[in-house]
Amino acid sequence: MNVTTTRKDLMIVNMGPHHPSMHGVLRLILTLDGEDVIDCEPILGYLHRGMEKIAENRTVIQYLPYVTRWDYLATMFTEAITVNGPEQLGNIQVPKRASYIRVIMLELSRIASHLLWLGPFMADIGAQTPFFYIFRERELVYDLFEAATGMRMMHNYFRIGGVAADLPYGWIDKCLDFCDYFLTAVSEYQKLITRNPIFLERVEGVGIIGPEEAINWGLSGPMLRASGIQWDLRKVDHYECYDELDWEIFWQKEGDSLARYLVRIGEMRESIKIIQQALEGIPGGPYENLETRCFARERDPEWNDFEYRFISKKPSPTFELPKQELYVRVEAPKGELGIFLIGDQSGFPWRWKIRPPGFINLQILPQLVKRMKLADIMTILGSIDIIMGEVDR
């Protein structure tokens, strides 16, 4: 009797672009030997919309609604970076009250982003309950956004020299109530998840990144801090009014998926601490710098020149970006979000290069999943936290 010989061929499998664990339209071409991953090739570009080229054909004010579509789960950060660049180029001072309002909005946005990372990450691993819990808290954050900005997601709230509107009456008390409630919710998550043996089995020691490796790959945000490096642009660059508030950089040294989970949970607690201090210490005064109106140009464009074709006969109020180049960055929930901006003495930027954290953090994925099991891909990709809107731009 002949024993049937088993085939030893490698198998090539497509994951995505329509896969629930891909967090958007990411496609992975996997080479498998049974359950073991031999190779992984990410295919990007399914959500490419030419955001950098669009920026060159818009004034900064016209471009503001577009930027909320990069990372559509943390839109305040994309708005912050879009107004910070022209503010630095034009030496525009932001009033203290506006700076405090910005910090409150940024940290609320960070919490909303981390919540919508936690739910799907747990669902990928096989825990369904936290997925429903996080929407309960995220809804409260969006209620606060809606009361202050009028929009739940694409806020369009930041303006050059300040913010679009002051905080409405009663909003500060409502936000303080949310902060008190949310700390108990985070404790509930930790009770539910952190010591769960099945969860620990799936994440402990999976996707380990050492500190030197993290720096060499250019990682940032929770990916970097989970590898033992205390680097946070809020402390390093001293932007807005973070220096006036008392908070700590949360970090872990293990570098695995569990460490990345713990860093994000810790960051949510620190964000609440920052928001509470900012709400209690928020000064009075204007919420925007009215001097920015002086930058409004009313000169008539020449017939058929570049600006004439885009802004039409009546120029919209904007200001010239001086002939300089500038790199601005903020600490977004996913890492360092930056733009490289070149002005050309016109209303349009000559070059607008986006440095998305998700795109750079994703580069290490093939190295992390090699020699791992197929099921670990969901864990590792989930712990990186990517949004394809900013990866593909």
UniProtKB/Swiss-Prot annotation:
Gene Ontology molecular function: NAD binding; oxidoreductase activity, acting on NAD(P)H, quinone or similar compound as acceptor; quinone binding
Taxonomy, superkingdom: Eukaryota
Membrane topology label: Peripheral membrane protein
Xref: InterPro entries: NADH_Q_OxRdtase_suD (IPR001135), NADH_UbQ_OxRdtase_49kDa_CS (IPR014029), NDH1_su_D/H (IPR022885), NiFe-Hase_large (IPR029014)
Catalytic activity: a plastoquinone + NADH + (n+1) H(+)(in) = a plastoquinol + NAD(+) + n H(+)(out); a plastoquinone + NADPH + (n+1) H(+)(in) = a plastoquinol + NADP(+) + n H(+)(out)
Pfam families noted in UniProt: Complex1_49kDa (PF00346)
Keywords from the UniProt entry: Chloroplast, Membrane, NAD, NADP, Plastid, Plastoquinone, Quinone, Thylakoid, Translocase, Transport
Family affiliation: Belongs to the complex I 49 kDa subunit family.
Subunit field text: NDH is composed of at least 16 different subunits, 5 of which are encoded in the nucleus.
HAMAP family in the cross-refs: NDH1_NuoD (MF_01358)
Function recorded in the entry: NDH shuttles electrons from NAD(P)H:plastoquinone, via FMN and iron-sulfur (Fe-S) centers, to quinones in the photosynthetic chain and possibly in a chloroplast respiratory chain. The immediate electron acceptor for the enzyme in this species is believed to be plastoquinone. Couples the redox reaction to proton translocation, and thus conserves the redox energy in a proton gradient.
Name of protein: NAD(P)H-quinone oxidoreductase subunit H, chloroplastic
Organism (species): Eucalyptus globulus subsp. globulus (Tasmanian blue gum)
